[in-house]
Amino acid sequence: MIFDKDDFKAYDADLWNAIAKEEERQQNNIELIASENVVSKAVMAAQGSILTNKYAEGYPGRRYYGGTDVVDVVETLAIERAKEIFGAKFANVQPHSGSQANCAAYMSLIEPGDTVMGMDLASGGHLTHGAPVSFSGQTYNFVSYSVDPETELLDFDAILKQAQEVKPKLIVAGASAYSQIIDFSKFREIADAVGAKLMVDMAHIAGLVAAGLHPSPVPYAHITTTTTHKTLRGPRGGLILTNDEELAKKINSAIFPGIQGGPLEHVVAAKAVSFKEVLDPAFKEYAANVIKNSKAMADVFLQDPDFRIISGGTENHLFLVDVTKVVENGKVAQNLLDEVNITLNKNSIPYESLSPFKTSGIRIGAAAITARGFGEEESRKVAELIIKTLKNSENEAVLEEVRSAVKELTDAFLLYED
């Protein structure tokens, strides 16, 4: 270590104390935010390495600065591992985030003002899939598709009909709050039928795709984007994949010099470490357990008539619950659960009647608790504790019982072993 913990604590006690408090919070809370996970110590070590000192504009073998031989090795490791994981011919590991990966993908496929179809935010889409407050909605003419109002599932006949009407240049598939399997082959059929390109944002399900537990979009999408955290269990960052050499060139130019300068090679190194972990057979077991734990929690809610799971269940790492029969809205539920050390987020549901700042639902994810070692029994217990909290929100004695139960679970499954 160049700068050890004792040096850090002595030099900047205020910052040290803040980080220590966050470590304590993560250890003592049950983390159910679907976009969060727990990285390995190896990932943290790589991200905190001396590579943070090095500027490296460009790409391996084509840098604008000298002294890049070593970071070329680092970045090439990340690229080759990403290609191996997803069976892609080309990979760009430099995006600082999933949103920037999406921005670069758009720049590679379409022009400002072009018509694009993306999933409606309330149906499970992401801000960068055309929300008016996002650069995507402000730069391109996005037309949203929604899930079926009855089944709350993707309706490919309706999406095809809509695509034939609006004639998009690009269709964006993928979601941040959709709990069922997505058939990317059908999206490609629709795109081909109307002469559009297909882009898939698999940020939430990338770890499941990597483990072979969700169909891969890579054979069907012209460009696939993802984050490297969430179910991939890596550092916070982005990744872009394609099988098209000409698109790969456009992607590289869109990232640098298009929207980014020097890559964060310490983060690229952390991505490389996490990709090595994904290639380990143990990762497939982890991903399978994520789905099992998600289903175990969902099953508890399905047995309670006061709660409704959107689309009737889950086939991945997350699910949405309509809580409005029990509490006023999703924000109230989120705040109540914060008080008992269970962390999740309020979330809009399809055809939402409340504002995004209140919402009718909550989103529950299993990636982080699975990384800590929770199994199906513990996952069912977590769901029971959520229900107990929301149904007894004014009973302090019951809430204290929940806090004690949460403490038992977090003490039994440490965030990190010493």
UniProtKB/Swiss-Prot annotation:
The modification N6-(pyridoxal phosphate)lysine is found at K230. Its EC number is 2.1.2.1. Pathway: One-carbon metabolism; tetrahydrofolate interconversion; Amino-acid biosynthesis; glycine biosynthesis; glycine from L-serine: step 1/1. Its cofactor is pyridoxal 5'-phosphate. It is found in: Cytoplasm. SUPFAM superfamilies: PLP-dependent transferases. It catalyses: (6R)-5,10-methylene-5,6,7,8-tetrahydrofolate + glycine + H2O = (6S)-5,6,7,8-tetrahydrofolate + L-serine. The record marks H229 as: Plays an important role in substrate specificity. This is Serine hydroxymethyltransferase. The lineage of its organism: Bacteria, Bacillati, Bacillota, Bacilli, Lactobacillales.
